[in-house]
Amino acid sequence: METFNSLFMVSPLLLGVLFFVAMLAGFIDSIAGGGGLLTIPALMAAGMSPANALATNKLQACGGSISATIYFIRRKVVSLSDQKLNIAMTFVGSMSGALLVQYVQADVLRQILPILVICIGLYFLLMPKLGEEDRQRRMYGLPFALIAGGCVGFYDGFFGPAAGSFYALAFVTLCGFNLAKATAHAKLLNATSNIGGLLLFILGGKVIWATGFVMLVGQFLGARMGSRLVLSKGQKLIRPMIVIVSAVMSAKLLYDSHGQEILHWLGMN
């Protein structure tokens, strides 16, 4: 048992719980993003340090995003050849963000991110026709790659929460993709930025590999189930999921940043 605990950093029971948490997170993440809301707190609750939890989370997240990407490529929803520039810019952006976060505090992002996530949820809620079908494309080539790949990729490497929603929003608003197609392409760039960020964590020696790989399998399975629903249900499923996940994520981010003030204001502290 001591050997098991030293290898996985958690007990067998907790490892089983983490596997199913990762599966659920992969399912949610493949549809609307936000799976890290489940996995990062779960890893920290299991006793990992914040650094180990973030690094191991990035490893297991690769399982879900890669699983979804493979599914969408095989269904010919996503073409790798058409996304080469976006992939390259996303990789560079995520590596840059992951490198910078080691030297710069992300406090400013923690303050403004809840507002941005709320705006995403409201955007999809108040524009019910958005993403129902393909529309005229507004941006091509390098400009789009810099915004969707470089900027969002940098954000994903630097901070991360809701990156999948930002990718999907870029494909809907700038490329004119329908919501299902945008979600599929978002997973490709999400997988790219996950890999880029993971490489930096590997160099830092913070990844708990055994636990991460077990969760990666759970993520892979959950994301495969979610990806099938994306193509079969389309925007009827994706839109409400994005709105719900955005609301939950905003609430959690606000609580993480201002939990004591909120409790005091409610008279609970």
Curated annotation (Swiss-Prot):
Transmembrane listed as a keyword: yes
Topology Cytoplasmic: residue spans: 29-30, 106-111, 178-197
Keywords: Cell inner membrane, Cell membrane, Membrane, Transmembrane, Transmembrane helix, Transport
Signal peptide as annotated in the record: none
Residue ranges that the UniProt entry lists as topological domain Periplasmic: 1-7, 52-84, 133-156, 219-269
Major subcellular site: membrane
Cited Pfam families: TauE
GO biological process per UniProt: response to heat
Membrane topology note: Multi-pass membrane protein
Keyword Secreted belongs to the record: no
Annotated transmembrane regions: 8-28, 31-51, 85-105, 112-132, 157-177, 198-218
Gene Ontology terms: cellular component: plasma membrane
Subcellular compartments: Cell inner membrane
InterPro entries documented for this protein: TM_pro_TauE-like, TSUP
Family statement drawn from the similarity comment of this UniProt entry: Belongs to the 4-toluene sulfonate uptake permease (TSUP) (TC 2.A.102) family.
Protein name: Probable membrane transporter protein YfcA
The species this protein was found in: Escherichia coli (strain K12)
Taxonomic classification: Bacteria, Pseudomonadati, Pseudomonadota, Gammaproteobacteria, Enterobacterales
Gene label: yfcA
